[in-house]
C-alpha cells in the first residue's frame, strides 16, 4: 500500500531514474534540472511504499515563472487551476492505482484551495495512448493542442473540472 508525502531533495536521484525510464512520455531530466523544477513547483507528491518512491507528481500553481510552453498555455487562460507538469509511475507497479491516488490528491488540493480545474498535457506525437485513456477516465477533456520543443513534440492540452 502506498502513502503520499511531498518530494524532497533526497528523492532527486530516484525520481530522475523513474523520470528518464519513462521517456519519451516525459523529457529526460538531469538531477540539476529536476532540482530546479522542484524549486519552482507549487506542489509535489511522492507515492512511497516503505522507503521506496514508486511514483511522483510535480505541479505548478498560477503565476509561476516556470517557462514551459504548456504551462504558459494554461496560465494565460485566466482560470483558477492547478497544473500537473509531470507524473511518473515505476513501470513495475503500473496499473496498481498509484496514478489515480496521485491525481485524487491533486483534485483534493485543488478543491481545498478553491480551484475550478486541474490542467495537464499528454503527448500525441510521439503518441501516448495509455496516458490519454487514463486522463479520459479521470474526467479530462481536450481544450487545445500545440507543438513544442521546436515542433518535435505535439501535445493534447487537457483540463478537468474540480468536483465540489
Locate each region found by the language model.
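Conserved GNAT acetyl-CoA-binding A-motif
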Residues: 110-124
Amino acid at each position: 500500500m502506498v502513502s503520499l508525502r511531498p518530494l524532497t531533495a533526497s528523492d532527486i536521484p530516484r525520481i530522475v531514474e523513474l523520470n528518464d525510464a519513462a521517456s519519451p512520455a516525459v523529457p529526460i531530466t538531469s538531477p540539476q534540472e529536476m532540482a530546479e523544477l522542484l524549486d519552482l513547483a507549487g506542489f509535489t507528491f511522492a507515492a512511497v511504499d516503505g522507503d521506496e518512491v514508486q511514483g511522483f507528481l510535480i505541479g505548478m500553481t498560477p503565476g509561476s515563472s516556470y517557462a514551459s510552453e504548456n504551462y504558459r498555455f494554461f496560465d494565460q487562460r485566466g482560470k483558477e487551476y492547478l497544473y500537473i507538469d509531470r507524473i511518473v509511475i515505476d513501470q513495475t507497479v503500473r496499473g496498481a492505482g498509484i496514478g489515480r491516488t496521485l491525481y485524487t490528491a491533486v483534485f483534493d488540493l485543488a478543491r481545498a484551495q478553491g480551484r475550478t480545474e486541474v490542467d495537464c498535457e499528454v503527448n500525441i506525437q510521439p503518441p501516448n495512448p495509455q496516458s490519454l485513456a487514463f486522463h479520459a477516465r479521470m474526467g479530462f477533456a481536450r481544450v487545445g493542442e500545440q507543438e513544442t520543443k521546436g515542433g518535435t513534440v505535439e501535445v493534447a492540452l487537457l483540463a478537468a473540472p474540480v468536483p465540489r
